[in-house]
């Protein structure tokens, strides 16, 4: 629990914004991965694949926070 008083409305707004940012970042990584697959750049493909997995985990975490605030 935070020591700071922030309204649930503001928290939800911030978390939804973060969720959108994560989805955009994931999409950018997928696009870059597609290009690097075509170029045969395996090291970059592996790095981007790892980034995509981290972003997916972050999305799940943010979605859980949103769900908890909506309960």
Enumerate the predicted regions with their spans.
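Short, charge/polar-rich alpha-helical segments
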Residues: 1-24, 50
């Amino acid at each position: 629990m935070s020591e700071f008083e922030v309204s649930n409305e503001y928290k939800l707004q911030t978390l939804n914004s973060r969720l959108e940012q994560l989805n955009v970042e994931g999409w950018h990584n997928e696009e870059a991965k597609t290009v690097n697959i075509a170029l045969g750049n395996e090291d970059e493909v592996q790095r981007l694949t790892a980034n995509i997995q981290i972003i997916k985990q972050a999305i799940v975490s943010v979605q859980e926070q949103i769900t908890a605030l909506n309960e």
